[in-house]
């Protein structure tokens, strides 16, 4: 296969593939994290808080990165997935972030516009700065209780996303 045109690119693509991504936006965000030298990147990381399980898109150490697309706040009738008013979806998202970050995790948020053009470089710098703050506050290593809970959730809970 070494002489097939494009085989080197195909091998790189396969090496970067991750079945945990739930959207192209998550895949592009994960690729940005890899390009920034952050890693390893864990996809769909479960955080169990107060009897609820919240699934974070991406995790590097104690830092989470969430990709935010508008589809989660747009109604089903308008091509989205939200079955509740946008105000309720956004309010729940805020409560979710507060609960997750209360467990000793930092978080960055990324949207489509952050992944292209001049904003991509600025987003990379912002994520590196936010990740550095998380490392300073919480260290590099995921606390054992979070790692243990995540392992248990992954073994016993079917993967489920809510809008």
What are these regions, as identified by a protein language model?
Residues 1-163:
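Surface segments flanking catalytic/ligand-binding clefts of nucleic-acid enzymes
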């Amino acid at each position: 296969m070494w002489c097939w045109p494009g085989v080197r690119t195909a091998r790189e693509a396969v090496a970067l593939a991750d079945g945990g991504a739930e959207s192209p936006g998550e895949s592009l965000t994960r690729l940005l994290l890899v390009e920034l030298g952050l890693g390893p990147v864990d996809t769909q990381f479960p955080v169990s808080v107060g009897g609820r399980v919240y699934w974070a898109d991406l995790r590097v150490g104690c830092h989470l990165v969430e990709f935010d697309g508008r589809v989660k706040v747009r109604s089903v009738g308008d091509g989205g997935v939200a079955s509740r008013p946008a105000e309720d979806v956004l309010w729940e998202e805020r409560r979710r972030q507060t609960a997750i970050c209360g467990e000793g995790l930092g978080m960055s948020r990324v949207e489509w516009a952050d992944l292209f053009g001049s904003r991509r470089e600025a987003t990379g710098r912002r994520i590196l700065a936010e990740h550095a703050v998380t490392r300073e506050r919480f260290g590099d290593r995921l606390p054992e209780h979070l790692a243990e809970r995540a392992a248990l959730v992954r073994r016993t809970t079917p993967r489920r996303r809510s809008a």
